[in-house]
């Protein structure tokens, strides 16, 4: 169990650092819009689906704490999503905030579905 906590911690550190890098880059591309958070949530959901399918079909469940809980848990974030939404809302950008919520939820669910579908096809 001690090793599992270390796997989650290491994966979380790597995932969080990657998210930070994406947010810096995205902030330069689209100042004022939380493209970084949107991007990591969609990419992370796609990766979650793909890796969940891979680990389930290839017997790699021992990697789940590092990859899924740690790396992808650190990489994606819905707490930042909620804060970004409220920031847009409080700036009076109500339509943008609502579009961001709808786009984030729909695209993230679509990405998980795509990841699971592709992953099951590739790794079954």
Swiss-Prot record:
GO terms under cellular component: plasma membrane
Reactions catalysed according to its record: fluoride(in) = fluoride(out)
Keyword Hydrolase: no
Major place of residence: membrane
Membrane topology listed for this record: Multi-pass membrane protein
Stretches that traverse the bilayer: 5-25, 35-55, 63-83, 98-118
One GO-annotated biological process of the protein: cellular detoxification of fluoride
Residues binding Na(+): 73, 76
Gene Ontology MF annotations: fluoride channel activity; metal ion binding
Pfam families: CRCB
Superkingdom of the organism of origin: Bacteria
Keyword Cell membrane part of the UniProt annotation: yes
Subcellular location field: Cell inner membrane
Activity control mechanisms: Na(+) is not transported, but it plays an essential structural role and its presence is essential for fluoride channel function.
Keywords of the record: Cell inner membrane, Cell membrane, Ion channel, Ion transport, Membrane, Metal-binding, Sodium, Transmembrane, Transmembrane helix, Transport
The protein's role, per its UniProt record: Fluoride-specific ion channel. Important for reducing fluoride concentration in the cell, thus reducing its toxicity.
NCBIfam families listed in its UniProt record: crcB, PRK14209.1
Record-stated family: Belongs to the fluoride channel Fluc/FEX (TC 1.A.43) family.
HAMAP family per UniProt: FluC
Entry protein name: Fluoride-specific ion channel FluC
Taxonomic placement: Bacteria, Pseudomonadati, Pseudomonadota, Alphaproteobacteria, Rhodobacterales
């Amino acid at each position: 169990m001690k090793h599992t906590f270390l796997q989650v911690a290491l994966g979380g550190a790597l995932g969080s650092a990657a998210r930070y890098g994406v947010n810096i880059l995205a902030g330069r591309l689209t100042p004022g819009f939380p493209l970084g958070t949107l991007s990591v949530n969609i990419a992370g959901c796609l990766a979650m689906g793909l890796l969940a399918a891979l680990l389930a079909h290839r017997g790699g469940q021992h990697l789940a704490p590092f990859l899924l809980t740690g790396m992808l848990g650190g990489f994606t974030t819905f707490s930042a999503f909620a804060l970004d939404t409220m920031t847009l809302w409080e700036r009076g950008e109500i339509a943008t905030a609502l579009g961001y919520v709808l786009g984030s939820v729909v695209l993230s669910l679509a990405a998980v579905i795509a990841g699971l579908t592709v992953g099951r096809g590739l790794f079954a």
